[in-house]
């Protein structure tokens, strides 16, 4: 008789479900066609609702890959690496994490799954990701986090760039952008 192989702690099928990139893009396209004024908020809410399960998957993955109980136990260098590898392995795309100013992180990706390759959109379109990342990073920080996408491949930008910070910080940045500043000027970087 043989002993069953040990089961790894991180099992994506126990924490998350997979959906194809085309399904995600079609969902956004259908919502834009049928419910245009509500697309961003609807997808952000859905992403935020899914954040807890993705965070639990990240916890299990970090335990297995890095030997820590919580992602927050990793120093900044390893946390950025862990987040990039984790989202890459789940199929979302690789992220580069960098500090912008004193209170904002930038998450950059040239292959983010939610971004359409067609280009030409007027605004950044990774709404589900914004909600999802806000919940995940809020749980990492053990507080509230907000996420705002400021560059998007769907808009023909080279990359998707998500800003992560405290809600009041991103609200102030958004207000400065509404007055005509670029996001870099609004952050002061």
Where are these regions (language model features)?
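N-terminal accessory segment detector
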Residues: 1-105, 111-128, 149-189
């Amino acid at each position: 008789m043989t002993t069953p192989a040990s089961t790894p702690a991180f099992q994506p099928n126990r924490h998350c479900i997979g959906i194809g990139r085309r399904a995600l893009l079609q969902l956004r396209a259908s919502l834009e066609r049928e419910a245009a004024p509500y697309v961003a908020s609807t997808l952000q809410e859905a992403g935020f609702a899914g954040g807890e399960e993705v965070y639990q998957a990240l916890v299990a993955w970090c335990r297995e890959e890095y030997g820590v109980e919580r992602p927050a136990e990793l120093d900044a260098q390893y946390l950025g690496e862990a987040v990039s590898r984790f989202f890459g392995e789940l199929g979302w795309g690789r992220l580069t994490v960098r500090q912008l100013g004193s209170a904002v992180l930038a998450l950059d990706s040239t292959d983010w799954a939610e971004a359409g390759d067609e280009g030409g959109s007027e605004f950044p379109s990774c709404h589900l990701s914004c909600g999802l990342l806000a919940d995940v990073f809020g749980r990492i920080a053990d507080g509230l986090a907000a996420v705002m996408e400021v560059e998007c491949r769907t808009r023909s930008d080279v990359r998707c760039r998500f800003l992560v910070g405290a809600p009041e910080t991103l609200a102030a940045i958004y207000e400065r952008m509404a007055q005509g500043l670029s996001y870099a000027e609004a952050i002061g970087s």
